[in-house]
Amino acid sequence: MLNNKWMNLIFLLLTLLVDVHLSNSLNQFFNEEFRLVSHIFLFVLVYQARYNQSFSLYWLYAIVGFLGDVYYFRMIGLTSLLFPSMLYVLRKFPKFQETNPFQLFLVVLLVNFFFEIALYVLAYTYQLTTYPIVDFIAFSLAPSLLYNSFISLLLLLGLSKRNNW
C-alpha cells in the first residue's frame, strides 16, 4: 500500500484522527445511551496485514496505538497492545492472503468484533468502565458493527473494482 514508512505513519495517524472525529460526529445524532464507534482504521490494518509483509509495520502500529491511547483514551496500554497483537494474529493465518472480497469482508467484521470485545475487557479489567456487558452489546457493539460493516462493504467494493477481484 504505502512503502515509505513516514508516509505510512502519516496515513495511519490521519486515518486514526478521522476515525475519532467521525465517531464523535456520529454520536451527536444519536441518543446519549448509544455509542457508535467508527473503525476505518481496523479496515486499513487488515488491508495492510494482507499486502505489506514488512516487520516495521508492527512498530508503526505500536506507535499509532500509543498515540491513539494518549489522544482517545488518555491512558497508555489499550490500543498500543491490541494493534500489534491483531496484526500478529492476522499474519499467522496463511490462508488470509488468498481471500476473495467476501471473505475479506468477514475478516474485517471479525477484527472489528474482537477489537471491541478486547477493548471492553481491558477497560473493565483496568476498572476504566463500569458499563455492564449487556448494555455494551446493545448500545455500543451492535450499532458499531452495523455501521462498520456498511463502511467496510463500501470500501471493499471500491477496492475490488480497483484491484479487479
What are the language-model segments listed below?
Residues 1-165:
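Terminal, non-globular segments
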